Amino acid sequence: MNPQELKSILSHGLLSFPVTDFNAQGDFNPAGYIKRLEWLAPYGASALFAAGGTGEFFSLAASEYSQVIKTAVDTCATSVPILAGVGGSTRQAIEYAQEAERLGAKGLLLLPHYLTEASQDGVAAHVEAVCKSVNIGVVVYNRNVCRLNADLLEKLAERCPNLIGYKDGLGDIELMVSIRRRLGERFSYLGGLPTAEVYAAAYKALGVPVYSSAVFNFVPKTAMDFYNAIARDDHATVAKLIDDFFLPYLDIRNRKAGYAVSIVKAGARIAGYDAGPVRTPLTDLTAEEYEMLAALMDKMGPQ
């Protein structure tokens, strides 16, 4: 799959990022991960992101990363394209990018660089180096310390033909509008704020109809129903699902920092696809919060 073919795929449909399965000892559990991917693949996501933020990329050792990406690629070879999360320092991101390409990933999600505050030019140099290290398509993720503006994204688009996507995790509407207007159809644009459904209607109005869904990990039917309602401008269904599910879900998620990942793993366990605990420094939901989530999921009916 060449970068432009990937861009076309990412321009339509719902995207998601499966959680990474760990066993009771905290080690990668490939059998559980295969079961998860086989469960999710038929629901109709356009692409899946392996070892992304929700997949706890930040906690994976290099050898584990290779196992996760290989397992995802092999399992989904005939069903759904796999993009691999990459990040960290520039050299580390390049190593991960080249490994993901070697293992057969169709593209990359370039997560924010590690910790260090950096100038726009420095961040752009980081993105360019990663793009030029591979031939597969790259989606850059503007979030946290990565805040590329429209000017630099335009320059990067000229220098890096395989930079084919922009994912927004900032929620800066002025910046999003300027990027969308300046870059036009050069990129595929993805909504990437936590619990992106809450922002989906607003982002669609900005020209960003595609987003990645965390809740697809445990209520895939509900996630697809919501996406389809957004796509056909069914405002009544969108409002009902936000009121009935997403706002109560946010009440639980927002109780502690890091719960954007923890609550997804809890949901997967409730759904019968236990992915094990989150790794430190994240913490799992309390027993009370777990029961609150279980009751909320029960209201959504069979998936």
From Swiss-Prot:
This is 5-dehydro-4-deoxyglucarate dehydratase. GO terms for molecular function: 4-hydroxy-tetrahydrodipicolinate synthase activity; 5-dehydro-4-deoxyglucarate dehydratase activity. It catalyses: 5-dehydro-4-deoxy-D-glucarate + H(+) = 2,5-dioxopentanoate + CO2 + H2O. SMART domains: DHDPS. Keywords: Lyase. CDD domains: KDGDH. It comes from the Bacteria. The keyword Lipoprotein does not apply. Its EC number is 4.2.1.41. It comes from Pseudomonas putida (strain ATCC 47054 / DSM 6125 / CFBP 8728 / NCIMB 11950 / KT2440). The lineage of its organism: Bacteria, Pseudomonadati, Pseudomonadota, Gammaproteobacteria, Pseudomonadales. GO terms for biological process: D-glucarate catabolic process. Pathway: Carbohydrate acid metabolism; D-glucarate degradation; 2,5-dioxopentanoate from D-glucarate: step 2/2. InterPro entries: Aldolase_TIM (IPR013785), DapA-like (IPR002220), Dehydro-deoxyglucarate_dehyd (IPR017655). Disulfide bonds: none annotated. Belongs to the DapA family. SUPFAM superfamilies: Aldolase.
